[in-house]
Amino acid sequence: MAAPSGGWNGVGASLWAALLLGAVALRPAEAVSEPTTVAFDVRPGGVVHSFSHNVGPGDKYTCMFTYASQGGTNEQWQMSLGTSEDHQHFTCTIWRPQGKSYLYFTQFKAEVRGAEIEYAMAYSKAAFERESDVPLKTEEFEVTKTAVAHRPGAFKAELSKLVIVAKASRTEL
């Protein structure tokens, strides 16, 4: 949308700015549908646990979080999944809403089914109140077409958040 040409006084320019902002605010959302968020417990004890959830038409996409951790007591974590309006992209975010986890993770892996990863990031600390996300060093984790996982020997046992953006897998005829 371009501004009409011609002379503008302060009132006309303000009116045009208000109309432009209104048009932007009222346009249909194009990004992600309303996400589904599910809570789950991350349990210490060194045993491998998994949690998964599906999203999309016909539960087209799956996000699975597999981990083993040591330390204190259970922590409540969340998994949020959403799809683009055309259902060609999906997001999976796994995180501890209280920010930093106090558990020591001996391993982790977040996998997607029905899609291929376009972007993934792992964080040692999740944003909470006035603090920002703190990403893991790239040498601590690896990303494949379908998973983000710890790198044995390089991962420093701190994990508080994982973010994945994936695109629908192409189906060949």
Swiss-Prot record:
Look up the signal peptide feature and give its range: 1-31
Q: What are the annotated disulfide bridges?
A: none
Q: Which UniProt keywords apply?
A: Angiogenesis, Apoptosis, Endoplasmic reticulum, Golgi apparatus, Secreted, Signal
Single GO cellular component annotation? endoplasmic reticulum-Golgi intermediate compartment
Instruction: Describe tissue expression.
Output: Expressed in eosinophils (at protein level). Expressed in bone marrow cells. Expressed in synovial tissue. Found in synovial fluid of patients with arthropaties.
Entry's InterPro entries?
MYDGF
Report the domain of life of the source organism: Eukaryota
Q: What induces it?
A: Up-regulated in response to myocardial infarction (MI).
Q: What is its main location?
A: secreted
- Enumerate the subcellular locations listed in this protein's record, separating them with semicolons: Secreted; Endoplasmic reticulum-Golgi intermediate compartment; Endoplasmic reticulum; Golgi apparatus
One Gene Ontology biological process: apoptotic process
| Biological function | Bone marrow-derived monocyte and paracrine-acting protein that promotes cardiac myocyte survival and adaptive angiogenesis for cardiac protection and/or repair after myocardial infarction (MI). Stimulates endothelial cell proliferation through a MAPK1/3-, STAT3- and CCND1-mediated signaling pathway. Inhibits cardiac myocyte apoptosis in a PI3K/AKT-dependent signaling pathway. Involved in endothelial cell proliferation and angiogenesis.
Q: Which family does it belong to?
A: Belongs to the MYDGF family.
UniProt protein name: Myeloid-derived growth factor
